[in-house]
């Protein structure tokens, strides 16, 4: 993927960058694999805002992506590489030998005409899906399942990949793009390779309207609101301090650096290295005999 730059002939193009879409081979999606996409605009069934800064945006049709890769031992051919408005990664259309068609996330360097397959005996090649237990150490993978046969849930964004670090017992240790290290069941499937469109993070929107096309509404600072709208609001003329010892959320809870993960979450024992605070858990100390200077 290449990035196209614009000259500053208008304020909106001064810092604007877009993709050249050079890897896209067709602009018509497979009709049998698209559905209507209903936008909730950040509201629940009562119309109450449950997620701020969402709403509007261009109409989109949802592409049905095969995250499970459960058509084992059936060879498929990459028919086209397409744009998906619902994600920053590209998608690849597969034609199976039995006539079925499915979309998958497009891995980097996978081209039209390539052959992919999923299953325990699949070769270690880009685009193939295998159980973690059969993937060699150090291999880059994406679209990883957290529970067997439930479909890939992590490492699906453009340009991301995880790395197989170790294998022990019924678990495989994986290093995620955030540098978090966690254990995953060895029966879980993952796809070989790195997700394509690696320059997606380098795109600059350039103007507010482009954010609105994506369905992103403005983010307003609490300090410029009224007291009825935010704990930071109010204060008279000009700029005023928030009047608190630390910043808080619109609902009065501490913000900036407060942990939000449930301390009793079932998967906590499987997370070996937490990056947010960069500390090693007791499980990692026992497993790798790591000494920490306190």
From Swiss-Prot:
- Single GO BP term: mitochondrial translation
Instruction: Give the domain of life.
Output: Eukaryota
UniProt KW keywords: Chloroplast, Plastid, Ribonucleoprotein, Ribosomal protein
Q: Where is this region: Disordered?
A: 224-249
Q: Does this UniProt record's set of keywords contain Plastid?
A: yes
Which HAMAP family does the protein's record reference? Ribosomal_uL2_B
Q: What is this protein called?
A: Large ribosomal subunit protein uL2c
Q: Which organism is it from?
A: Porphyra purpurea
Source organism lineage?
Eukaryota, Rhodophyta, Bangiophyceae, Bangiales, Bangiaceae
């Amino acid at each position: 993927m290449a990035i196209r730059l614009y000259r500053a002939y208008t304020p909106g193009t001064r810092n604007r960058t877009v993709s050249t879409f050079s890897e896209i081979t067709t602009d018509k999606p497979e009709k049998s694999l698209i559905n209507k996409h209903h936008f909730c605009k950040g509201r629940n069934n009562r119309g109450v805002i449950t997620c701020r800064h969402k709403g509007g945006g261009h109409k989109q049709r949802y592409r049905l992506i095969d995250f499970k890769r459960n058509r084992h031992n059936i060879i498929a051919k990459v028919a086209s590489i397409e744009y998906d408005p619902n994600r920053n990664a590209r998608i690849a259309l597969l034609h199976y030998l039995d006539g079925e068609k499915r979309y998958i996330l497009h891995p980097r360097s996978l081209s039209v005409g390539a052959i992919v397959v999923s299953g325990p005996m699949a070769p270690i090649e880009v685009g193939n899906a295998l159980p973690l237990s059969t993937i060699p150490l150090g291999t880059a993978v994406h679209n990883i399942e957290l529970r067997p046969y439930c479909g890939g849930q992590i490492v699906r964004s453009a340009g991301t990949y995880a790395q197989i670090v170790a294998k022990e017992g019924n678990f495989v240790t994986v290093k995620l793009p955030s540098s978090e290290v966690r254990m995953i069941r060895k029966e879980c499937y993952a796809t070989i390779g790195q997700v394509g469109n690696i320059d997606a993070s380098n795109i600059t929107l350039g103007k507010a309207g482009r954010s609105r096309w994506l369905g992103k509404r403005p983010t307003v600072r609490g300090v410029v609101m009224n007291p009825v709208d935010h704990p930071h609001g109010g204060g008279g003329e000009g700029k005023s301090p928030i009047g608190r010892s630390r910043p808080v959320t619109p609902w009065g809870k501490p913000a900036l650096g407060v942990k939000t993960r449930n301390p009793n979450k079932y998967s906590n024992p499987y997370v070996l290295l937490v990056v947010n605070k960069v500390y090693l858990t007791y499980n990692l100390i026992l497993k790798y005999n790591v000494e920490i200077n306190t």
